Structure formats: C-alpha cells, structure tokens
Amino acid sequence: ESKILTNRNIIQRAKTIMPGLIYDENPYLVIDKDGKLVWVLDAYTVSNDYPYSQRVTIETNGEKREINYIRNSVKVLIDAYDGTTKFYITDRSDPIATAYRNIYPDIFMPKEEEIPADIQAHFVYPKLLYQVQAEVLARYHNVQPEVLCRGDDIWSIASKSVGKTSTKAGTEFEPYYTMVRTIDSEKAELGLVIPYSQFERQNIISYMVGTYSDNGEAKLKIYKFPTDSNILGPMQLDTQLEQTTNIAKEIENLNVNGTSITKNMSIIPIQNTLLYVVPIY
C-alpha cells in the first residue's frame, strides 16, 4: 500500500500537531525491544507570567522568547518508518500540560498508557531545560538570603579558547553530552555536563551533571570543590599547553600556509577527578 508522507522533519511534524509546546532542537534516535527505530523529542510547557521568578531568554528554531517557567512535561515518540506520533505527558503535576490534555484529549496518550520501559531506558537529560537551569544556577545556587542580596557568591559558566589563547577570546562552554562517572555513582553513564568558575575568575569551582536513571527518572546534581582548592580552568590549561615546548612546537608546525587551529575542549568527571580532553584540528 502506497502512502504520501508529509511533514517529515521531526520537529516540524510535532509542531504542526501541537503548536502550543516548545520543542528541543536535539531529537535522538533509539531502538526499541523489537528493533524498530523511534525518534524521541523533548517538549516543554513554558510561561513568562509565573510570579516572583527570574526571567531568562531562550532560543528555539531561530525564535527568541523570555520565560520564567519551564517544565519538560511532554515526551514525543515518532516512529521513524511510518511517522506515527505519540505525545506522552510525563509530569502530571504540571497545570499547563494538564490543561492541554483537557483541551485536546485526542492528541495525548491516555493516562493509563505509559512510555515503554525499553524506550525510557534510552532517555537523556533534555538540553534546553539544562541550559536554562545552568544559567539560573549561576546566581541562585546559594540559598542564603543575605548572600543573594549582596551578590558576592555568583558563578559564571567556564570559558574555553577555540584557537590560540593569545589571539582568541574565550567562549562559554555549551552543555555537552559525555560519559561520566561521578564520585557517588557506581557506573559510567551518559550525562550533560557544564563547569563553573567564580565570577570573573578562571579556576573551576563546581560542575553540574544531568542524567537519566534506567527507569526514566531525570537527575540533576551539582558537585562543588573545596573553597581552598586550586583547580585549573580551561583558559589556564590552554596557556600551560602553549607554554609547553613540545606541544607548542607541534601546534606551530600545524599552523602553516594559512591553516587555522581549532580546539574543542571537554571536561569529563571521573569520580573525584576532572579529565581535560583537548582535540586540536
């Protein structure tokens, strides 16, 4: 039987069906227990009218908007072969998602139908939500009212260089997926990572990891280093690398005939240690 399939772009397909949600720009493909390919797309309910809450700016699909409320309350599963699209509400305490279900009962899967466990086992922490949390955490990680008012314990997302340190300004780390094994974890798992420095300083003082448990539960943890620790930040490490004779010579040999040097540093948590990995292109 022949079919004409339209709206084959994963995000546009979901947006056409349910335009009231915000969709992550990073859908991912998983394999279910029967060997079928299924796209997983994280969807969010948002608002900019939540009382007494910090506003942040998000950008999705080229559109910017201010919000002060965001929840990853919906997961969209799309069959990669025939395009069958299913919307699951995963956070039933979210009033916005509940309102959408009441208005559009035929779009969302019935309450009694859960996401298959073999699909849940492949969930990863949603990137857009993580980016918002990382930005807000830089100021609000300290919950002492007097410290918040003074603003003397503010973090900033760590910066790294993408070219030669002497000629390129640092750029903030973007959240990235990597295998992590934190000090309180028994095994390595896929997580989102972002490192922090004290405001206007370069040393690493903490990092945040977002993971999913095997039963589909999102976990977000912050790991702080002692205040007297002196852990090199990415920019400081880059400076050391360029002052190391052998490495500096190799980079100089590559930088000939107009060739540009690009680096993309990653920081990988391994128990109580941070491993810096610096590919050079």
Task: Pin down the residues of each PLM region.
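A conserved hydrophobic secondary-structure block that centers on an alpha-helix together
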Residues: E1-S53, R71-S73, D79-Y81
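Hydrophobic alpha-helical scaffolding
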Residues: I4, E63-I67, Q198
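Beta-sheet entry/capping signal
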Residues: L37-V40, S73-V76, T84-K86, E189-G191, ...
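Soluble extramembrane regions of membrane proteins in the secretory/endomembrane system
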Residues: Q12, E66-A121
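Accessory, solvent-exposed terminal regions and/or long lumenal/extracellular loops of proteins
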Residues: L5, K15-M18, D32, I96-Y281
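Mature hydrolase/peptidase catalytic cores and their serpin-fold inhibitory cores, especially
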Residues: P27-K33, L37-I70, M109, H141, ...
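Short, flexible loop/turn elements at secondary-structure junctions
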Residues: A43-S47, I78, D91-R92, Y196, ...
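A short, surface-exposed beta-strand/turn
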Residues: Y52-F87, S206-E217
